[in-house]
Amino acid sequence: SRRKATLGVLLGCVFTVSFMITLLVVSLKTVADDLNSTTGVISWAITAPMLAFGVVGPAFGKVGDLWGHKRVFVGGLFIAGVFAICTALAWDAPSMIIFRTLSAAGGSALGPAAMAYINRMFDPSERVRPLGYWSFVTAGAPVIGVVAGVPLVSIFGWRTIFLMQAPLCLIGCIVAWWLLGDTERRKNVKFDVQGALSLGIGSVLILLAINRGPAWGFISARTLSVALLGVVVLIYFVRVEKRASDPMLPLQWFRTRNVAFPVASQALTNFAYMGGFMIVPQLLEIGLGFSTSHIGWLIIARPLVFSLVAPFSGRIAMRFGERNAGVIGAIAVMFSMLLLSQVDAGASDLYIAFGLSLSGMGLGIASPALTALLANSVDVADLGVASAVQQLLNQMGAVLGAAVMVGVHEATISSGIVKSFSYALLAGAISSAIGIFAASAVRRTPRVL
């Protein structure tokens, strides 16, 4: 059917802007050596796009809601493809980081637009299943990228990553323009420029302070100044939105139970999920002396299980309800952190893989259900910006989790290397436990139209 074909195109295009993320992470040293730089500098090719991906999304989501998501989707994909070519041709570290960031900024348009299409195509009672497929793609793409891409990178070099991505993006533009239908355009509504700029600037300052906290020091003057400036800008954003006739982000959403609590639960579980992504490989390498290849095949268990569980999350949600699916998922992530916090020299590969798999299973169950609850609680005309705000807050939770859990490890390293990693993972367990309570606070409500 056309609906299935459209879903396939949306997910295929999302895959093209997602598959290289983990592959680039494992190739940082190769990139640094080729560009006569250091991994510390080249790591900004991960950090800067991550900031751009979360921050630019709300503006793209709002533009799509106002002027049509087809143009935003195809335009974002085109930008991602053009700057992927530029990244492949980068001549030094700054050019590579800039081009990669611009490519990610274009790719950030796809998430809100694709979610808006999915939520328009499927009735509220049907949304969990296609959102499960969405989670399958977003979790599975990095796995496929690593498995298929590492051999190519080792033979042909890191530029292969982007030489593969660019034609996929441009082909996706053609297919999407041909197949996707136009969404409705809202007349006599202005784009909230002040709101978009203040939300974007405030968010990037907060994310930057969180991300650089471990390097600068969480209580250093630089970190506190950046964070304080971010808070001031976000306060200004709230004042702008209260006065705006057509606000960028309806503030009343955060007083709606099925908007505030699903977003909070996802951010809290992403805190643990992303923090674990940073901590566990270090635990295995530095604490236990595992080889890089050994670690790679162990940590792949988490996104693999995520991608396998997500397509079935619809059945789980329909059987037990979205709230229970969110609670079950957060519980699984919490137990994952608790199990991994007990890893020591005597832990078996099976035990470690099981602990990692629980994290993947938890997010695979919870994310589609909580995303569907959010979509069912906002007006159809605001689905793009709602999805983008969810993307932004999830990103904030992930960045905060990575920074805080690394900070806990560094602050407690005097107690022993392995023990300090254990304390960091316990911080993730606490965050997930709070996420359980947030998920339990949601309820099924009629969709607000």
Per-segment meaning from a language model:
Residues R3-M20, L24-L28, T39-P49, F78, ...:
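12-transmembrane solute porter fold
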Residues V55-P94:
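Conserved MFS/SLC helix-loop-helix module at the cytosolic interface between two early adjacent transmembrane helices
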Residues T101-F136:
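Cytoplasmic helix-loop-helix junction between adjacent transmembrane helices
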Residues D34-N36, G68, L89-S95, D123, ...:
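Helix-breaking motifs and short loop linkers at transmembrane-helix boundaries and internal kinks
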Residues A166-R185, G200-R212, L229-A244, G435-R443:
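C-terminal membrane-cytosol helix-exit motif in multi-pass small-molecule transporters
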Residues T30, P58-K62, L66, P151, ...:
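Membrane-interface helix termini in secondary transporters
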Residues W134-I174, F191-G200, I206-A227:
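Helix-loop-helix hairpin linking two adjacent transmembrane segments in secondary transporters
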Residues S1-K4, S125, C173-G200, K242-R257, ...:
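Flexible interhelical linker loops that connect adjacent transmembrane helices
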